[in-house]
Design a protein with these regions (language model features):
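Catalytic-core regions built around general acid/base machinery
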Residues: 76-86, 162, 218, 250-253
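Residues that line or immediately flank small-molecule/substrate-binding pockets and catalytic motifs
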Residues: 32, 66-69, 98, 136, ...
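Histidine-acidic metal/acid-base catalytic patches
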Residues: 2-58, 182-290
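Glycine-rich, proline-tolerant flexible connector loops at the mouths of alpha/beta enzymes
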Residues: 63-80, 139-142
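Conserved beta-strand positions in the central sheet of alpha/beta enzyme cores
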Residues: 61-63, 93, 133, 230, ...
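Metal-dependent catalytic neighborhoods of phosphoester/phosphodiester hydrolases
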Residues: 72-78, 110, 274-277
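Short acidic/polar active-site loop segments enriched in Thr and Asp
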Residues: 60, 90, 130, 260-261
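Active-site acidic/histidine proton-transfer and metal-coordination neighborhood
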Residues: 10-27, 51, 83-96, 100-204, ...
């Protein structure tokens, strides 16, 4: 199916959802990863993201994924910015992967990783985003506390560097629980305290925790540093509830922390299509936010 035909069939098959009123407790954004399969199959591309979010789902906030972009050139960013202006959408953050290991044991390598993120700071500022999401990954696989502390020292140097670059542009640098030691909330909190900069924070993801970790307690630990929230969802019951995560319970954790900014839908399920999953997630968040 060609891209235009796909978009037309989508509009016919999935009625557009209403936009969320602005006086609610939080605002809903959409993580571009939710449509990564459609982009990967070339049914749509990154430039379609603003229109799909706004017209199909009534969502204003956009959470971009750098790996889904054609190229981070000035011309490409200008095209994307125009699409956003045309649809009345707003950049929230850019999820950045593949730019190097911020916790690498070789200082030259980790400083190169920090430098690699600078272009995304510039692009985030151009698109009106408040943050770039980075990773605290390393070439080391630390097991004991002393080894973890060493990796945290490496990460702290890298994040101090990129946060210093990002501060004049008023861009935050945020860490998601995204595999490795970042899936341990206590380790992430240690890094937050070690860097201790106002534009360094967390992006708590409702998923991405090992089975042995209590996800609700983990998110509670990350929320004091949160500059965004990722509503990971996998599947929904006939009643519209998420089947893996108790979302009302999780959103109580978020609300109790005093958070009232963007909550990004990130659908990663297989049973529903990407667009059906996003719509189900939007309906659930709207119900909670009513």
């Amino acid at each position: 199916m060609k891209r235009r035909s796909f978009l037309q069939s989508l509009a016919a098959a999935l009625p557009a959802l209403p936009a969320l009123a602005q006086n609610k407790r939080f605002r809903t954004s959409l993580a571009e990863w939710s449509i990564h399969r459609a982009i990967g199959s070339r049914m749509i591309d990154n430039l379609d993201f603003p229109r799909i979010a706004r017209e199909q789902f009534g969502i204003e906030g956009l959470e971009f994924v750098n790996g889904l972009w054609a190229a981070p050139t000035q011309e490409y960013v200008a095209q994307l910015k125009k699409r956003m202006a045309d649809t009345g959408t707003k950049g929230v953050l850019i999820m950045c992967d593949g730019e190097g290991l911020m916790g690498h044991s070789d200082r030259a390598v980790r400083m190169k990783a920090a430098t690699n993120h600078r272009k995304w700071v510039d692009i985030a500022a151009e698109l009106g985003c408040h943050s770039i999401r980075t990773n605290m990954h390393s070439d080391l696989k630390p097991s004991g506390n002393a080894e973890i502390e060493k990796v945290l020292d490496y990460c702290a140097e890298s994040f101090n560097n990129i946060c210093g670059y990002a501060a004049p542009a008023k861009i935050n640098v945020i860490i998601e629980n995204h595999g490795g030691i970042s899936s341990d909330p206590d380790v992430v909190v240690r890094l937050m305290k070690k860097v201790n900069l106002p534009n360094f924070g967390t992006l708590p993801d409702f998923g991405n925790f090992p089975k042995e970790v209590d996800r609700y307690e983990a998110v509670k630990k990350l929320m004091p540093y949160a500059k965004g929230v990722s509503f990971k969802c996998y599947d929904f019951s006939p009643a519209g509830d998420e089947t893996t995560i108790d979302v009302p319970k999780m959103m109580k954790v978020v609300n109790d922390a005093g958070y009232n900014s963007w909550v990004g839908i990130e659908y990663e399920g297989d049973r529903l299509s990407e667009f059906e999953g996003i719509a189900a997630g939007k309906r659930l968040l709207d119900r909670i936010n009513a």
